[in-house]
Amino acid sequence: MDPKTPIETVAETVATLIMEGKVLGFGLCEVNADTIRRAHAVCPLTAVQSEYHVMHRAVEFSGVLDVCAELGIGFVPYSPLNRGFLGGAINEFTRFDPSNDNRQ
């Protein structure tokens, strides 16, 4: 999404595509509670996706989960195992590609 384009404009475009039968639903990723409300007011959101796991719980405190529950929007957690760290895929022997090091 172009950050210079108002979310309402995006939602209007998606609503048109839904009415034309070209799109089944409207979802957003990594947005704040205000953006969710603004978009949902124009075109009902089906789902919101954000990073959420025991080490990254920002959506609990930012109002994202609350607004999704209030408006009946599905929430899809991204990286529930923290990109493999919580599942044991990453340990002290893991070697990272310097050109794609996500530890930063």
PLM ranges: what are they?
Residues 2-104:
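Beta/alpha (TIM)-barrel catalytic core signal, keyed to glycine-rich beta->alpha loops juxtaposed to Asp/Glu
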